[in-house]
Regions:
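Fibrous stalk/shaft segments of extracellular and virion attachment machinery
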Residues: 1-90
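Collagenous Gly-X-Y triple-helix signature in extracellular proteins
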Residues: 79-323
Length: 323
């Protein structure tokens, strides 16, 4: 066989190989033994090199290069996602109160307060005991409500790491005073004087007396014209919450917006900020703020912020620190 190549060109004489433009164009391949040539359509060569593009799992199936570019683009996006995940993992892996109070989720802490949990709190790590966790001890449910809530507070600085804990429901009902007076404010009330004794005995039995932290608290101790008018620092192990701890602000307490009922407990508990549904447990329970000469504040069973006469018997749902 002879082929006339008088008007032919060498491949190197073409500006670009793309001069062969159609899938119907052919390549003539000389057989190795010199006996002839084979005619190969360019489309067959393309299919051999690229494979079947319809089987690609990419969105773009127009060409192999387009598919490769798409994959590299996805790889870049995925790399960014992986870096973001690494940063999130690093953040969640941090220890301390700020992480414990910021990433709040409900989790079971068991049926007893363990030595391991105590060590975790005392070290200030809060890896085992985080805000949002709960214990069920002797049939009573307790919430871990705020890590290091009173750290660095007090006329004598509190330097011990701790978890503020509250019961899910009131321990029992009690009066603020036997008559409808608020004389002496919270510190001078029957509730503070004797009404919390059984609650303290209960939490000591449930968590261990050595794990209830004695610390200094600033409490209102005088009333003038129906408003709290004085305060002082006292040693304490258990107290009623105030409006700021529950709501994050005044509701009915504070009168002319004095701060005697607030004291050092000026921030909403992290648990209540994340889970306001836990404020309302379908009970009426006392707060320590003075409303008037005859009323103390309370959380109503309907969920409303309210106040009532001091001699009414409402729920006792105090807060305490464990370590």
């Amino acid at each position: 066989m002879q082929i006339d190549v008088t008007n032919g060109k060498r491949f190197t004489e073409y500006d670009v190989l793309a001069a062969v433009a159609s899938g119907e164009d052919v390549l003539l391949v000389r057989l190795a033994d010199g006996t002839g040539v084979k005619r190969i359509p360019l489309s067959a060569v393309k299919a051999f090199i690229n494979g079947d593009l319809t089987t690609l799992e990419t969105e773009d199936k127009t060409s192999l290069i387009a598919a490769i570019n798409e994959v590299f683009g996805l790889a870049g996006t995925n790399a960014k996602g992986i870096n973001t995940l690494k940063e999130l993992t690093k953040m969640l892996g941090q220890t301390g109160a700020s992480r414990a109070n910021s990433f709040i989720y409900e989790h079971d802490l068991g049926t007893s307060f363990t030595a391991e949990q105590s060590a975790d709190i005392r070290a200030g790590k809060f890896e085992k005991v985080r805000t949002g966790g709960y214990w069920t001890i002797n049939g009573r449910k307790y919430w871990a409500a705020h890590a290091d809530y009173r750290l660095h507070c007090g006329d004598t600085e509190l330097t011990t790491h701790h978890m503020l804990v509250i019961p899910d429901r009131s321990f029992y009902n009690g009066v603020m005073n036997d008559t409808n007076v608020t004389t002496g404010a919270y510190y001078g009330s029957k509730m503070k004087t004797s009404g919390l004794a059984d609650a303290l005995a209960t939490v000591k039995a449930d968590f261990g007396a050595d794990h209830i932290l004695t610390h200094r608290v600033l409490l209102a101790n005088a009333v003038s014209n129906g408003l709290s008018s004085g305060w002082a620092w006292y040693d304490s192990q258990i107290d009623l919450m105030n409006e700021h701890m529950v709501y994050g602000s005044y509701a009915w307490g504070g009168g002319s917006q004095n701060g005697y009922d607030v004291g050092a407990d000026k921030s909403q508990l992290a648990l209540f900020q994340a889970r306001p549904d836990l404020i309302t447990n379908r009970e009426n329970w006392w707060l320590r703020d003075v409303r008037s000469a005859t009323y103390f504040c309370h959380v109503d069973d309907s969920g409303a912020a309210d106040a009532w006469s001091a001699s009414n018997s409402l729920g006792v749902r105090p807060a305490f620190l464990i370590y």
